[in-house]
Structure formats: C-alpha cells, structure tokens
Amino acid sequence: GGSQCGFCTPGIIMRLEASKDLLAHMCRCTGWQTINEAVQVRRGEVVLPQSDSRDLVAAQKRAALEGRATQVVGPHVALGAGGFADDIAPTNSLVAVPSVAGEWFVGETTADARRAAATVQGRKSSLSVTYPVTFPEEFAHVSFAHTLQTTWVEPAYLEPDAVWCEPHGEPVGPLLNGGAFGGKSKTSALALELQEVARRLANQHQRPVRVVLAREDVVRRSPKRPPMALAVRSDGSGEVWVARTSGLVDIISDYAPKWLIHEIDVDGPATSVDVRATGWAEVAVMKSSVSPETEWGDYVVSPEGAQAWARVDDSGIHIRVQCGLVLDAVVLRSYCIGAAHMGLGWVRSEGIAVNESGEPVDLTIRSFGVIRAVDTPSIEIEIIDNDGPSINGSDAVFAAVAAAAWRAAGFPSTWPCQR
C-alpha cells in the first residue's frame, strides 16, 4: 500500500526516515501514511498477519477503479520501474521543451533545450488565492444555511507530462501509470498536442525525441478544478454558480436534480470535470452540512453508489467505506488514505494564485498547498466488504472527508480556510 503511481517512492526509500525527513519529498497519491507503514514493516517494527499469496491481478483491477486509469501494482513500481514515459525513452533521444510563448526548442539534453528556450524556473508567488465566482448582488444569504466559495485547485500530479516518439513511429505517453486524479487524459488537448509535437520533431530530426514539460509548464497548461460559489438550504436544496466548464452542468444536475446551476465566464486557467469528483463532490459536501451527523460522521454517496463516512477530530481522520467487492484491501485502503489526505487539503490549504490576466502564478509543487507529511494527521480506514459490483470508493472518501473537515472547522465560507 506504500506505492500507487510509483513516481515519488525511489527518493523516499533512499531515506527511510521519519515524517520530518520527508519534507524534501512529495507524495500526492498515498497521503504519506502507507509509506511510513511500509517502512515500519520493512524494518521489522510492525509484523503483518500471515496470509495467502496476494492476487496482483485483482490488485490492479482495484487500482484501475480507484485511479480511473491503467495502474501497475508490484514491488518494482516502488523502486521506480512503473513505466513512466520519460523513464523508458531511448537514451539517444533529443529533448524538446516549450518556451513561455509556446514555441518548441530541441537540444541534446534537457539543459540544452531549456537554455535555447530561455526558460526560467517557476516560483511561488506572493499573491493570495482569489474567489472569481461570486454570488450575485441580489443574492439573499439569509435564506440559506451555509454558503461556500472555492478557488482554482491544481491536481498536483507529480510526474510532469512527457511523451517520446521514434521517427515514423507512434508517440508513447503521457499516461502510462496512475490516473493523476483526472489531471491527465490520453485524449486531452494537452496530451494530443504533446503527442503531435513528439511525432513531428522525431520525423523532422530523424532521431527519437522526448517532449518534456517542466513543473511550471504543467501548471500553465494543465486543467484545474473549477472555482464555484455554492449555497444550501436546510432542506438540502440549493444553488451553485460555476466557472463555465464543459460537462459540469450535466454532472451536477444528474447528482442533484433540484439544485439551480448558473454558469459564469471567468478569466483563468483551463478547467476540467475530469479532476477528481468535480461538481458532485462540492454539492455532496453542501448537502452533508445540513444533514444530521451520523454515528460515523458525515455521510456521502457517490454517483456510482459508493458509500463513505468520515469524522475529523483531534485524534485524526476516521473513515468507513463500502464500494462493492474489495478485490484487494491493501490497494483500496491506500487509495482511501490518499483521498482523505487530498480532501483535507482541499478544505484547509490547497489552491493556486492567479494574476489579473488569468494566468497561474504559483508555479512550484510546494506552492499548491498540499499538506506535508509532518502535518498529516493519523487516518483510520474501515472497509465494509460486500459481494456487489466493485466500484470506485476513494472519490466518495474524498468528498466525505472534505465534508467532515468543513464541519470540524465550523463551516467557513471560503476554501482553503487555513491558507
């Protein structure tokens, strides 16, 4: 359970130290806890109960459900052999990188290409996050139990988009392991652009070409979670104003038919409904806020029918999840812990600053507000098995933890609330 996409683990394994020594590393998938647990098992500090040999085929099926993309499972993934595109490119490949203006430059090495493109390493800005979707002037707050405004949120997947191609061949990448929380797609505009660039440059130079984005390129080009303004009445009905995003109205109306939905045009980065649980999770959080807290905390049902309960208190995050036949408890638990970490960060700290021109200006992985290992509370997961069809469970956990974290914070009117 200490590895999902496998991008961060090689560097972490080199340390095998406590959470404070993970400050130089970032993991977006696991929420840190399962990495620490795996280290404790390796050191002999924790002894796992004996069991039959693990079914890695079933584990990969569960991982594909949770990551919503092909997912490789096995010890080799944690050691850096998960098959990321840039790791398996031919060693004699040229390197292509974009300039800020979008022109492509080619070099023998990444440094050569970046020098030719005159790229400047991205930095964290001093700007605060903003809330571009606002309530209309005539909006009557008094008729609603809770209101909430959110901002742009970076998916923050760790592997920057990369594609390589041989002359007259087919491009490889960018999505080979892990779902990137919906931030990557084989058919997205960005993926198609990178594939076409790799193919064109490989044919032009008659050499294999690696097309590689730096972190700042990813932030500028990849889609974000769209900002919203939401209001819920005590009976669970409500209204939502959303940054115009293809498919978002349909997702919300299917999940909450009685809600009124208003699309707003805002200047800002591209947004996508593919980002984890976009649209329905926001509404689920609002509806949970006016429902009595259950014995196990805030309760959320995903559009697929997965059920999750979550409570956030001083002792940590406590979760129950039911999502059909488990297939592999290690993988499911790992994804649910990662979803809890992400849901907590969504409420407390995650967001990116955007300038007056609508361009992202927080351009480093650390500037997105992802909760650090040392600041991550203990997360307990109870899995309820049944013989129903296996469905994604971690997205329901993501929404339930966000609902519980919002309740624990006293329902502040903006997220992130501790930035």
List where the protein language model places each region:
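Zn2+-dependent cytidine deaminase-like catalytic core
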Residues: 1-22
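Cofactor-binding beta-sheet edge motifs in enzyme active sites
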Residues: 3-6, 25-419
